[in-house]
Amino acid sequence: MKIGRQSKIVELISKHNIETQEELADLLVKAGYRVTQATISRDIRELKLTKVATDNGKQKYIVLTNQESGMSEKYIRILRDGFVSMDMAQNIIIVKTVSGMAMAVAAALDALHIEGIVGCIAGDDTIMCAIRTVPDTISVMEKLSKLINGNK
């Protein structure tokens, strides 16, 4: 049952731009599966699904390959370990880090390929992230907050 459901989830995600757990649950119900929000949440975690930005500014679930998932987790851990605070100035995000961690955190940000970040410059405890537009800056800050707080 679980294997079949999770296979169906992967299939649905590859065919549809699914933004929320509710959308995924609705599609699973239409496909004949009885699911709860807790089941969906557990499946998302076990399948290592993540959200990425689409071209129209929305988000969708995708399945990371094992290599991408493992590396992504390492970069997120570096981000969490080094992060102190962040603030925005127009289309620039200033990230404060633990002393000596700015280079590692900036490299992690670059490696995560977060939509909207043009590039990062790091000092000892401060990173300047250039963002494409002001609205993108707000979106990137939200994504970073989710990553840092454990909500991919």
Swiss-Prot record:
It holds the Pfam family Arg_repressor_C. Pathway: Amino-acid biosynthesis; L-arginine biosynthesis [regulation]. GO terms for cellular component: cytoplasm. The keyword Repressor applies. It is found in: Cytoplasm. Keywords: Amino-acid biosynthesis, Arginine biosynthesis, Cytoplasm, DNA-binding, Repressor, Transcription, Transcription regulation. GO terms for molecular function: arginine binding; DNA binding; DNA-binding transcription factor activity. Gene3D superfamilies: 3.30.1360.40, Winged helix-like DNA-binding domain superfamily/Winged helix DNA-binding domain. One of its GO terms (biological process) is regulation of arginine biosynthetic process. It comes from the Bacteria. Its main location: cytoplasm. The keyword Transferase does not apply. NCBIfam families: argR_whole. Belongs to the ArgR family. PANTHER family: ARGININE REPRESSOR (PTHR34471:SF1). HAMAP family: Arg_repressor. Regulates arginine biosynthesis genes. This is Arginine repressor. The lineage of its organism: Bacteria, Bacillati, Bacillota, Clostridia, Lachnospirales.
